């Protein structure tokens, strides 16, 4: 805690400043002595709320409770920061406008600042520049649940404390001047506030509401309040647009520029006057605010509320107890822990009612205590949620249910909901990752059936945005992370087809990797690389980062990324170049997991070195000492520090695993709570200096519950079941510990595994899935002979020699007898192509590849058209764009065709380069095939009556599906992507085939 005592208060004249300084010193002694006398653990005394209040940290020093709806904190005049962010309070300032009841911690964007009030002496002023005040940090004090400052301009001593939904202010006015309470309700941090309303209910109660834009001015929300004074007032009034209206009881603001406010004036006292205000807020209504006030602040004892807040914070912070290290390092640690316990925030009233995202009034679901709001999704899924699953499991389950309620009310899971306003700030689908992490941690106290439905809905909606015109690499990588998380959950919940499809989507980050440059790069809609790429350039297709930073953002598949970059040695070399070349940004989210990636490359000692170095350098006990000056983003950067100092971090948000680094303290204990089985998990680090200096920071050996731990990771259950992790540290790295390939943390690639299924193409060739889209040509032998069980989503059918056909079997059994539907996107990239066919074979056909000649119809033979047992439907451009139904003849390698001329009259041109066509082929289960193609909003549809031989072919219960294409000329390319296969009325589905209709 930082205690600021006015150095010049000891003067012969007993001024207000002297009294303030004396009271400040006495309060310090009074609060600290009992704790020391009793020997109780008092982590509140190790929290400095001023850490992070400058250099862009954007934290607030005011009074709040853990996850409280109210954050009663000072606001300074609105001003932009050099980095484009903004904050309500900056430690470098010396002028405060007043206080407001709502804030977010560390978001770097104008937000909240609702229900603003202040105090003055003398004449009533209605402009912020006039009613604000100068102050000195020597006369300012902050600790969890309490804030105090001496208002030099007015000679007023101000103190603040808070409950969950309410706050109390205590003003000690000097004698000899009128005392004023001002409520400039239109004053909000977003600058935009209307409509607003104020009403004097009686001579000690003011009520009203303020409507303000929420988070980066994206949406609006309304906050209702009730303000009461312990001293009835006789002189009061309102103002609008600077004009005062004495004794007016009600006022509305309907236009942005007509700002309103209320004032209360007390006569000049002959001695110091103490005025207390208690303020309750609600997002439901004025009645809700009044009930919150009645439930939480029934009396007027400021000290009782302050002590209650301190007790609440001591309980919350005592969930982690550390030993060792300097006092400064302990202050940094507990302040970081404090910051992780601020958001998300409680959003329901004391009676259990809350306003939903649909703007309707709802009740907290049965079995849950609270509804939470303010999910900084893009940030918190990385570190905040993994930490909270350990420390606050019951709250986290309520948070998960709150996300589910958002889906029920809006039909979507938004990535950055604030208050009751659904928001889409940033990119990706981060709250899916949050829900999965919570579930995988064993916290099942929320409606997963509805949650999964919402996450699946999100996944389908987001996947349609791939390869968009803005070529946003960051967005695609972020989506891959959530796809991987949901894939693992789908497998757990026994949705194998969806799990397979999502796992495939999760690996699409590889399609953004350009082996020529060694970086993830944006692509154009036609698949070509966007020109002018510079990996060090900030922005431009990378959200808040560079190509260097986003090279590493594949936490779901780090082992796949290792292979993509050429193996462990090449991966580690490039990662080292990333750090040594000053490309790493420890102040922001995109690459905060990067130091832990050495654990995947057989060099955990380098993870230990980098983490310790960055923690010491960027986290200090100064106002600018949070993440090197970055936004805390609702506890995300603070959570990184807390986890890293405990000795582990969650790289992959979709699993319940933690990657290891060296602990920062000699002993740390996590006190666990239900529903976890364990009572405590202890981290004991031996031979650690504990002084925050370079030295004994390298893991030499480790024991987990008495058993040797030789790998640089463990599961979350190892913690939540309780136990002891003992780590022996040394001054020199042990390059063997955790270095074996088998010891690397699991990734999507390693979980999916590799199977014996092979893609088949022209006689004599097999190929595996390469790092990019699958290319079928005459050079496939260069690829390895084993491929993943899950097919790639995009296939490139390319010929390097004139007149060669290519084909690929998807090697999945499908149900033919029932209705089915296959669909895909078809793109001709350059030149002309002979066409393509969707090929279906019954189970007796086999998959023997036969030689073919030119033409995509002959490609059916190359693709394995077996006599009597095969059917192909597709487009033959070689004869002038015919829709053909081809099937095997009774004998030999010839075909029968049912051509349907398309010619130049068809609305869809299959021979037009770089114009995507969506193709759908469906079977009604009887005698009809339906072929449909859509291009640029125009659609071609044809129903084909099957002859009896084909009807019998499809009567076979099971079969195989494949694709064949003929390019017919040098360097002609077709791209097939977005595969879908769905069966109707099916009682048996393929084990691993993508089935969105499941």
PLM ranges: what are they?
Residues 30-36:
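Signal peptide processing junction and immediate N-terminal pro/mature segment
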Residues 46, 96, 146, 155, ...:
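Extracellular structured ligand-interaction cores
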Residues 759-994:
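Polar, low-complexity loop segments and adjacent catalytic/binding residues used for recognizing
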Residues 1-12:
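N-terminal secretory signal peptides that target proteins for export/translocation
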Residues 161-163, 174, 267, 686-688, ...:
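Short beta-strand micro-motifs enriched in acidic
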Residues 36-385, 389-433, 439-477, 490-496, ...:
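Accessory carbohydrate-recognition regions in carbohydrate-active enzymes
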Residues 19-28:
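Bacterial N-terminal signal peptides
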């Amino acid at each position: 805690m930082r205690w600021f005592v006015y150095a010049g208060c000891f003067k012969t004249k007993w001024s207000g400043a002297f009294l303030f300084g004396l009271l400040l010193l006495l309060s310090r002694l009074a609060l600290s002595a009992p704790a020391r006398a009793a020997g109780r653990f008092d982590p509140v005394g190790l929290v400095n709320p001023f850490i992070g209040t400058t250099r862009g940290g954007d934290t607030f020093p005011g009074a709040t409770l853990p996850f409280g709806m109210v954050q009663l904190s000072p606001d300074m005049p609105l001003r932009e920061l050099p980095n484009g962010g903004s904050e309500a309070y900056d430690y470098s300032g010396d002028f405060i406008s007043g206080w407001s009841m709502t804030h977010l911690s560390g978001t770097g964007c104008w937000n909240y600042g609702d229900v603003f009030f202040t105090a003055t002496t003398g004449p009533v002023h209605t402009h912020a520049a006039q009613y604000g005040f100068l102050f000195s940090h020597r006369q300012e004090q902050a600790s969890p649940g309490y804030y105090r400052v001496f208002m030099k301009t007015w000679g007023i001593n101000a103190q603040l404390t808070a409950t969950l939904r309410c706050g109390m202010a205590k003003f000690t006015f000097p004698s000899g001047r009128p005392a004023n309470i001002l409520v400039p309700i239109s004053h909000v941090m977003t600058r935009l506030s209307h409509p607003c309303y104020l009403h004097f209910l009686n001579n000690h109660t003011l009520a009203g509401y303020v409507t303000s834009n929420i988070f980066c001015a994206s949406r609006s929300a309304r906050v209702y309040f009730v303000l009461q004074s312990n001293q009835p007032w006789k002189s009061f009034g309102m103002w609008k647009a600077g004009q005062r209206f004495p004794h007016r009881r009600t006022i509305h603001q309907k236009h942005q520029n007509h700002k309103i406010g209320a004032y209360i004036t007390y006569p000049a006292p002959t001695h110091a006057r103490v005025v207390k205000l208690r303020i309750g807020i609600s997002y439901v209504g004025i009645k809700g605010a009044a009930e919150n006030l009645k439930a939480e602040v029934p009396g007027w004892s400021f000290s009782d509320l302050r002590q209650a807040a301190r007790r609440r914070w001591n309980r919350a912070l005592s969930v982690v107890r550390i030993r060792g290290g300097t006092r400064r390092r302990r202050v940094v640690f507990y302040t970081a822990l404090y910051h992780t316990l601020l958001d998300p925030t409680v959003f329901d009233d004391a009676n259990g009612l809350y306003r939903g995202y649909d703007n309707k009034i709802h009740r907290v679901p049965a079995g849950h205590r609270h509804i939470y709001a303010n999910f900084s999704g893009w940030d918190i899924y990385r570190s905040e949620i993994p930490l909270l699953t350990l420390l606050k499991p019951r709250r986290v389950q309520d948070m998960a249910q709150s996300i589910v309620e958002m889906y029920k009310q809006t039909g979507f899971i938004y990535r950055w909901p604030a208050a009751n306003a659904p928001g889409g700030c940033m990119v990706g689908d981060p709250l899916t990752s949050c829900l999965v992490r919570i579930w995988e941690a064993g916290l099942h106290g929320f409606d997963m059936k509805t949650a999964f439905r919402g996450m699946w809905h999100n996944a389908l909606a987001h996947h349609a945005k791939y390869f968009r015109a803005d070529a946003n690499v960051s967005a695609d990588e972020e989506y891959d992370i959530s796809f991987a998380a949901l894939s693992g959950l789908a497998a757990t919940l026994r949705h194998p087809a969806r799990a397979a499809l999502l796992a495939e989507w999760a690996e699409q980050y590889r399609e953004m990797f350009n082996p020529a440059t060694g970086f993830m790069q944006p692509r154009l809609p036609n698949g070509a690389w966007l020109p002018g790429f510079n990996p060090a350039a900030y922005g431009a297709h990378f959200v808040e980062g560079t190509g260097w930073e986003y090279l590493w953002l594949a936490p779901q598949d780090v082992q796949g990324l290792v292979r993509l970059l050429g193996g462990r040695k090449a991966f580690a070399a490039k990662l080292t170049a990333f750090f040594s070349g000053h490309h790493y940004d420890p102040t922001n989210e995109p690459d905060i997991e990067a130091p832990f990636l050495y654990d995947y490359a057989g060099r955990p000692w380098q993870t230990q070195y980098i983490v310790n170095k960055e923690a010491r350098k960027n986290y200090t006990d100064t106002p600018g000492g949070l993440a090197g000056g970055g936004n805390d983003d609702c506890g995300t950067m603070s959570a990184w520090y807390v986890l890293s100092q405990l000795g582990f971090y969650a790289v992959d948000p979709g699993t319940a695993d933690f990657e290891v680094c060296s602990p920062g303290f000699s002993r740390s204990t996590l006190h666990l709570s239900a529903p976890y089985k364990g009572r405590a998990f202890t981290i004991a680090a031996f031979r650690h200096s504990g002084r925050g200096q370079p030295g004994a920071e390298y893991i030499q050996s480790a024991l987990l519950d008495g058993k040797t731990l030789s790998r640089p990771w463990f599961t979350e259950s190892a913690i939540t079941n309780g136990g002891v992790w003992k780590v022996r540290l040394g001054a020199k790295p042990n390059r063997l510990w955790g270095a074996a390939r088998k010891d690397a943390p699991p990734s999507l690639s390693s979980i999916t595994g590799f199977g014996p299924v092979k893609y088949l193409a022209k006689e004599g060739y097999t190929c595996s899935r390469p790092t990019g889209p699958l290319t079928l040509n005459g050079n496939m032998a260069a690829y390895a002979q084993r491929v993943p069980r899950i097919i790639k989503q995009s296939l490139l059918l390319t010929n390097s020699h004139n007149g060669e056909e290519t084909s690929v079997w998807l090697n999945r059994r499908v149900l033919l007898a029932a209705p089915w539907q296959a669909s895909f996107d078809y793109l001709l990239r350059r030149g002309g192509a002979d066409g393509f066919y969707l090929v279906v074979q019954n189970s007796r056909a086999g998959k023997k590849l036969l030689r073919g000649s030119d033409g995509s119809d002959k490609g059916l033979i190359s693709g394995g058209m077996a006599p009597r047992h095969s059917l192909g439907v597709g487009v033959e451009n070689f004869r002038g764009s015919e829709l053909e139904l081809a099937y095997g003849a009774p004998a030999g390698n010839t075909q029968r065709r049912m051509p349907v001329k398309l010619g130049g009259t068809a609305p869809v041109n299959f021979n037009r380069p770089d114009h995507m066509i969506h193709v759908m082929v469906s079977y009604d289960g009887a005698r009809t095939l339906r072929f449909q193609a859509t291009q640029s909003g125009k659609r071609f549809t044809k129903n084909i009556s099957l002859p009896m031989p084909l009807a019998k072919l499809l009567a076979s219960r099971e079969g195989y599906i494949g694709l064949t294409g003929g390019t017919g000329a040098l360097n002609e390319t077709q791209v097939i992507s977005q595969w879908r296969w769905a069966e109707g009325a099916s009682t048996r589905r393929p084990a691993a085939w993508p089935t969105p209709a499941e």
